[in-house]
Amino acid sequence: MEQVKRVYTFGDGKAEGDATMRDLLGGKGANLAEMNKIGVPVPPGFTITTATCNDYYRVGQDAIVAELSDAVAAAIAKTEASMNSKFGDASNPLLVSVRSGARASMPGMMDTILNLGLNDEVAAGLSAKTGNPHFVYDSYRRFVQMYGDVVLGMKPENKEDIDPFEAIIEEVKAVRGIHLDKDLTVEELKDLVERFKAAIKKQTGHDFPTDPHEQLWGAICAVFRSWMNERAILYRKMESIPDEWGTAVNVQAMVFGNMGETSATGVCFSRDAGSGENLFNGEYLVNAQGEDVVAGIRTPQQITKIGSQRWAERAGISEEERAAKFPSMEEAMPEIYKELDSLQHKLEQHYRDMQDMEFTVQEGKLWFLQTRNGKRTGTAMVKIAMDLLHEGLIDEKTAIERCEPNKLDELLHPVFNKRALAGAKEITRGLPASPGAACGQIVFHADDAEEWHAAGKKVVMVRIETSPEDLAGMAAAEGILTARGGMTSHAAVVARGMGKCCVSGAGGIIVDYKERTVKIEGLTLKEGDFISLNGTTGCVYAGEIPTEAAELSGDFAELMDLCAKYSRLQVRTNADTPQDALVAAKFGAVGIGLCRTEHMFFEPEKIVAMREMILSETAEGREKALEKILPYQKADFLGIFRAMDGKPVNVRLLDPPLHEFVPHDQAGQEEMAKAMGVTVEYIRQRVNSLVEANPMLGHRGCRLGNTYPEITAMQTRAILGAAVELKKEGLDPHPEIMVPLTGILYEFESQEKVIRDTAAKLFAEEGVSVDFKVGTMIEIPRAALTADRIATRAEYFSFGTNDLTQMTFGYSRDDIASFLPVYLEKKILKVDPFQVLDQKGVGQLIRMAVEKGRSVRPELKCGICGEHGGEPSSVKFCHRVGLDYVSCSPFRVPIARLAAAQAAVEEVK
């Protein structure tokens, strides 16, 4: 392999990297280097690059280890010099941590090992040097536990079992009658080390390595391997993080939070990650190591006094008891707190964003182990962006870029109905780890959560604590409840990042995985029982509580105003009812981009008349039935035009094949026979005659209108009749009539003539006319290829990207699920093309159609109305190819508006 620099060192206020090198050094490595340079105390160490991770998978472990060995040895020597100790030396040992660090934050998804370098001789030497054997053997048993899990694969044998190491610890504590790990004696800790080693040998067949250099290479390679573990792959898929980015490996001198009562470890945030409030907050544990906080093994205490008081109030603990038993760091370690507060402020000012920081206090000295832009809820994301804008730390364009479009979805999630909540039975309280309202059936294991979710059930996952292996279950659940863990535990951090409701550290619950029960204050709930969680307050309720729409904040409105200021691309909505139209208008939709007329026919009184029209064999019979349908259609359009007064409403003429409307069951056919005064056999024969081998490519869209022009005429009268009536009332309707599934100019011309002839007749009858446009959906590849011809008649194009994707790929939307998972797994496809617009294929047809159409009609309006209209990357593509608008479901409107603004900001850059 070509010799490239693979190892970058940092320490003593110097670093070979900086914050701009996150692609190469990963987020953690780049920030460790940057913190060194700006005077934040960071233990020395080195970073192995993300490119090395990719080469690890390309050329194999042996080749990478051989190439890295000299550079790693030199970096270890540099770290030894900084710490005045020696790696593997029994009398003056250097211990290190080995951590992952991708360029995008992936909390808990990859592996970490602490206290590396310990063996029996080093432990004895370190005990003699420090005079603190309890700290040494506590660190040693932690190291064996982590290494056994991460490197040697020591896992629970089945999902009902707890961690095998924890099982041994619990057994030892039970014999002694103690509850906390820190109460274990030195002899018990030594015994745990030996029992852990024996358990590893028995379960894995591997001896625990005693050579520190062998330990180091085992850990480095394990971190590289963890890039491709199941949970990391799933997380990358959820967060759209490319596999080819790879992870860096950070090797850093250990500092110890478990050296006694003047030592501690913690995680803190420069602002509240749940609400966005400008309030420094976090959690710490005295005499502990960092993984204790993140893993949720012990429920920690608050860093700030105000945070501690809020926690005590929620937990029902008096101020006197709180101050005595659960003091904040601000009270218990005031000097350390003052330094921590000063440095967190410095880091936020430097990075100009909310920071998530990890730190350790070793015998009264503060060290920072990492900083990163913190994961946050959708609510916090918007508030923090607006607050930083007001504080002058960022400008308007940066505020727009700081917000992730898909996370706006969280702000629109329902909350518990206030009246129902007032009468609900609260059964316990925990920490409000991630806001929102969640209700579902209890499950205890991640695979069960996935299975129940796939069966259409809503579930709440209840765990003692979550681990990264639970990620898929957390994604499937409505919410998460844990017995252990704080506001910075794995469950809390991941839930906030996913926008999932979470209540953590509910100490009043007892979870029994084998019995599949949870006992809460004397109440026993079983798997399948309903439970409700309020992640904003930490309250847990028995049973189901109904929800209602959330109220949107002033910060949200301000962000939407910024989006309007910078966007060129407009956002409409897909809406078939006045209610949907009003919701979308509230979110800022400038019109309706797709109103589907067929959805209006499925109400009981309408479907009979519709079926009568379809099942009639003569034009006279169809027209008679259409006369019954006309007032229903007109009434529907009156409501929608009224809701969208002054805004364009694009109505698609009847599109689906007729067989979708007719009764296929015996009872339905008997009902129609009675209504039409014909035999059941006649109805059955007519229904059978409508069945097609490939209905999506059959008698539908404009083909229906051209074979049954009376349908188009009726719909035109309903649309324009409603517009005329509202104009007489003084309103300002803007109807647009869209011909679906056009592939040939003559198909469109034929339908346009019916529409315009019907309009002229209607306007003459009413003595009033309204302006309207006639356009077409571009959803057949031939229409895109001949768009210049179609644009000679069509006044606008609306790209139906669902069907255009279907016909371009030759994939059936209804059947793609049979092979899509395999295609995604094998990377034949990177994403589902029905979810994310295929820019290289379908996108080029759109680009071509826009260019061809505007070559003959420069003022041609173009938009899209498929599901892609609310997907951020697709919206940005639509901006780049010059579309005028996108249209999406009402609750995706804010997401599309933000994506459109970001596209405009990115274009200027």
What are these regions (language model features)?
Residues M1-A424, E451, K457-V460, S467-A472, ...:
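Nucleotide/phosphate-binding sheet-loop regions of phosphoryl- and nucleotidyl-transfer enzymes
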Residues T47, A51, T466, G485-M487, ...:
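Short, ordered loop/turn segments at secondary-structure junctions
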Residues N250, V443, V460-R463, L481, ...:
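Structural motif
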Residues E478-R484, C502, G863:
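A short, small-residue-rich loop immediately preceding and capping a beta-strand
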Residues G17-R22, S434-A476, V842-E859:
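C-terminal accessory/binding modules appended to enzymatic or scaffolding proteins
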Residues M238, I400-W452, K458-V459, E527, ...:
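Long, charged amphipathic helices and adjacent flexible linkers at domain junctions
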Residues R99-S100, L552, L562-K909:
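Conserved alpha/beta-domain cores
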